[in-house]
Amino acid sequence: MSRNYFGTDGIRGRANGLITPELALKVGQAAGLLFQRGEHRHRVVIGKDTRLSGYMIEYAMVAGFTSVGMDVLLVGPMPTPAVAMLTKSMRADLGVMISASHNLFEDNGIKLFGPQGFKLSDDVEKQIEQLLDESLDKKLAQSASLGRARRIDGVHDRYIEFAKRTLPRDLSLDGLRVVVDCANGAAYKVVPEALWELGADVISIGVEPDGFNINKECGSTSPEALCRKVREMRADIGIALDGDADRVILVDERGHIVDGDQLLAVIAQSWKEDGRLSRPGIVATVMSNLGLERFLQGQGLELVRTPVGDRYVLERMLADGYNLGGEQSGHIILSDYATTGDGFVAALQVLATVQKLRRPVSEVCHKFDPLPQILKNVRYRSGKPLDTDAVKSAIDTGQKRLNGHGRLLVRSSGTEPVIRVMGEGDDRNLVEEVVDDIVTAVGNAAAAA
């Protein structure tokens, strides 16, 4: 069965476009029916980020869940990993994060977590999709069995304590000046507070959400403001989170960006030296730079690749027993601590390494020289541009031109109508020519559809 609603990271789209109150209500009903197992009172934890449409979707989902007899615990703006953690710790049957992650405020989305705090599998999402296409009127709860909803206090402190416990008890961030950019998103309260409690000198930006400014010229997808602030304040490090704080990008004291691949390299090397890697390797996606793979090989570590999407990284980690994985975009999964990507906890692991080594971030966090990597996006309205003969021919020609001295990846986005064309290799000019040829072919195919 084709997937009409779920992408690689839940359901995501334009608020009041794809993501309507009607859809949110139906998702609440469908997921609520599917996760009511056993005779106990069933409940769901719902969190959100700071975008304006969060109110609309939150209340619609409350109506959906309570209409099928589930109690709802509302935690308000909280990081996605915090919602996953709370779902498990509060013994809920289900967790929901209302967020479109790094997208601007016009979009929103629905991420679902099972009772152990893990994102739902493809099979479970397909079951929910089947229910979305059915009439559920006859499956609603009786009047006396409707669910209740209430807001929960103290959840911020729970997450702060959880994050702090991922560091050694005797480790302090005293002496570190940290600029943190919370993207005017879900982490705007908890992360600055946690850093302060750990002893850092904290300078916060992106902590004034108004419903419209989430991810707007700030956060991990737009770290330029953070780079400037780090240099201006002569800070030791900058931390950029995205709107729901499940991804992170760092900035060194010189204002240079440290992406997810470099973070994986730092943590992998540190954990190997401390004997903390459960297996001699890590898991990343097909988008991770070949430079990371070569660095890990030099450390005696393997890089296992998966399709794009942190859920696929985690699935491979769990299946094969790895405890470190992530994406170039900054989703870092530390399965010893969390069930999903946690940008803040990942940043703390790097800060711990910096404190242990007592060296500048620029020396600690740039582990390898990345190969030239070029990524271009082509939007399309309809059809399947990748299935055309012209595009297939362009890809085949590009592979032959790289001739084993680089990589080529052409794929459809799982969250928006975009074809992503990525090439990397030792010869930047050749890579750029190959990528441009494929982009032209995809653009022509999209225009003809």
From Swiss-Prot:
The active site is at residue 101. One of its GO terms (cellular component) is cytosol. Its cofactor is Mg(2+). The modification Phosphoserine is found at residue 101. GO terms for molecular function: magnesium ion binding; phosphoglucosamine mutase activity; phosphomannomutase activity. Pfam families: PGM_PMM_I, PGM_PMM_II, PGM_PMM_III, PGM_PMM_IV. It catalyses: alpha-D-glucosamine 1-phosphate = D-glucosamine 6-phosphate. It is an enzyme of class 5 (isomerase). Activated by phosphorylation. Binds 1 Mg(2+) ion per subunit. InterPro entries: A-D-PHexomutase_a/b/a-I, A-D-PHexomutase_a/b/a-I/II/III, A-D-PHexomutase_a/b/a-II, A-D-PHexomutase_a/b/a-III, A-D-PHexomutase_C, A-D-PHexomutase_C_sf, Alpha-D-phosphohexomutase_SF, GlmM_bact. Keywords: Isomerase, Magnesium, Metal-binding, Phosphoprotein. SUPFAM superfamilies: Phosphoglucomutase, C-terminal domain (SSF55957), Phosphoglucomutase, first 3 domains (SSF53738). Its EC number is 5.4.2.10. The keyword Iron-sulfur does not apply. Catalyzes the conversion of glucosamine-6-phosphate to glucosamine-1-phosphate. This is Phosphoglucosamine mutase. It comes from Bradyrhizobium sp. (strain ORS 278). The gene is glmM.
